[in-house]
Regions:
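RNase H-like, Mg2+-dependent phosphodiesterase core
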Residues: 1-158
Length: 158
């Protein structure tokens, strides 16, 4: 596995947000992150990940902070570590037809549905709730702070 750059060592996401939710009774916490910009850059994709309460995988970072070889090296470890994960897509045609906001929502719903489990809480990277449904929490720079969002960010880019 490639060694992480020194600048990444201090920026490890953790399970603090997830632990708070688990302690409050939310057993299934899903982290989501999106990649892509629709018709001018291909499909829009949203990753969803459920991480275990009792095990960690080290070297997970916000995927934007990892080089492509680092992301590729982490992919199998992250995929095997997650209790569940999925990626949902909205095609460039759906992005054109629905608009980017609705296409992002569609891709998120597809990813969450593909998990095969009903989430108690969904953590979203960013400041906009593109999932909807009331059981969501938007976290600015969530991929740098929440381990489930960081896992989703790695899985969606593979």
């Amino acid at each position: 596995m490639p060694r992480l750059r020194k600048s990444l060592k201090a920026r490890a996401p953790n399970l603090a947000v997830e632990r708070g939710l688990w302690d409050a009774g939310h057993k299934i916490v899903v982290g989501v992150d999106e990649v892509g910009r629709g018709s001018w850059a291909g499909p829009l994709s949203v990753g969803a990940a459920v991480v275990p309460h009792d095990r960690r995988v080290y070297k997970i970072r916000d995927s934007k902070m990892l080089s492509e070889p680092e992301r590729e090296a982490l992919f199998d470890r992250v995929a095997n570590w997650c209790e569940a994960w999925a990626v949902g897509h909205a095609s460039h045609l759906e992005c054109d037809e629905l608009g980017m906001s609705e296409a992002q929502r569609l891709a998120a719903h597809r990813a969450i549905a593909a998990l095969g489990i009903e989430p108690d809480q969904v953590l979203i990277d960013g400041n906009w709730d593109f999932v909807g449904g009331g059981n969501t929490r938007s976290i600015i720079r969530g991929d740098a702070t929440s381990l489930s969002i960081a896992a989703a960010s790695i899985l969606v880019q593979a």
